[in-house]
Amino acid sequence: MSALKRMMRVSNRSLIAFIFFFSLSTSCLYFIYVAPGIANTYLFMVQARGIMLRENVKTIGHMIRLYTNKNTTLNGTDYPEGNNTSDYLVQTTTYLPQNFTYSPHLPCPEKLPYMRGFLSVNVSEISFDEVHQLFSKDSEIEPGGHWRPQDCKPRWKVAVLIPFRNRHEHLPIFFLHLIPMLQKQRLEFAFYVIEQTGTQPFNRAMLFNVGFKEAMKDRAWDCVIFHDVDHLPENDRNYYGCGEMPRHFAAKLDKYMYILPYKEFFGGVSGLTVEQFRKINGFPNAFWGWGGEDDDLWNRVHYSGYNVTRPEGDLGKYTSIPHHHRGEVQFLGRYKLLRYSKERQFIDGLNNLLYTPKILVDRLYTNISVNLMPELAPVEDY
């Protein structure tokens, strides 16, 4: 009888332990699914100490090589991903003097005296009315947020595309921060907010494709920046022009402790020339929910023969605006799609996209509303 009681006590403890671990694991899985951005941030913070240690060891070796190489300069601006020598051989940074004289007939320089470096990032909420009032004094800003310098010829005509849903508190902060920076950089630019309506999961990549097509109908842009609304640059020397290779601007996010999460990370803020974006057939349309579309874009870029460049040093630092709502659900099918990136590249992208937009032009941006559904981007078998 006593043996039976002992067995029942053991069974009860085992049952309680099983229920506890089952509840804990299901809670964790639910959290990861419904709030993947937060979950990944916490996971990355746990891993960050190990990454920082490895980076410090790498930096020591890097500095030793720089010291022993007489032909190497320290204050570089750009380095291409994937090039073995690019970690050490970088171009020097030279910014023009304050008394530099511009010419309306000559291209604007890329390194202007007004670009001082560190920016004070204020993420305090502000109303759109206040932001409109602040920029109402600037008569050179045309409807849609279009602006071009008058004292020199802009080196790039930049369309800034912003995928959007339910982030109304972020937009005014974004414009308050970005407009002065792009004006300092003497770029011609305008903003396109692509807003997803309806009940389908958020499709960031498809919104970018819609925004690209509509922006090309609006003006003759030659550079396109794909910009999350909650990322604010911390350095005005992070030049928002394009180049011979696609550009990943947001190399160091504060929510990732200013460490690149992984080599192929291409999220947050990226830029391609119009020619480059068309060559890779844009973003994939099949990623519904959180995650995967940037990794697929990275694959498309490399399959098309490009490398990715990033700002050097602290130029690529960004602050993330805090969220006051739950993020998008995780897209569980992304890994299968990523396995077939190459096969899908030219059957899913700009060339299979159908949509009906509603366009409203605000003083500071063009709003493109679109109800996205999977049947708007039919994909052939692959």
Curated annotation (Swiss-Prot):
Its EC number is 2.4.1.-, 2.4.1.274. GO terms for molecular function: galactosyltransferase activity; metal ion binding; UDP-galactose:glucosylceramide beta-1,4-galactosyltransferase activity. It is an enzyme of class 2 (transferase). Optimum pH is 7.2. UDP-alpha-D-galactose binds at residues 163-167, 202-204, 229-230, 258, 290, 323-324. Residues 36-382 are lumenal. SUPFAM superfamilies: Nucleotide-diphospho-sugar transferases. Keywords: Calcium, Disulfide bond, Glycoprotein, Glycosyltransferase, Golgi apparatus, Lipid biosynthesis, Lipid metabolism, Magnesium, Manganese, Membrane, Metal-binding, Signal-anchor, Sphingolipid metabolism, Transferase, Transmembrane, Transmembrane helix. Inhibited by EDTA. Glycans are attached at residues 71, 75, 83-84, 99, 122, 307, 367. The chain crosses the membrane at residues 16-35. Its cofactor is Mn(2+); Mg(2+); Ca(2+). It is found in: Golgi apparatus, Golgi stack membrane. GO terms for cellular component: Golgi apparatus; Golgi cisterna membrane. Catalyzes the synthesis of lactosylceramide (LacCer) via the transfer of galactose from UDP-galactose to glucosylceramide (GlcCer). LacCer is the starting point in the biosynthesis of all gangliosides (membrane-bound glycosphingolipids) which play pivotal roles in the CNS including neuronal maturation and axonal and myelin formation. This is Beta-1,4-galactosyltransferase 6. It comes from Rattus norvegicus (Rat).
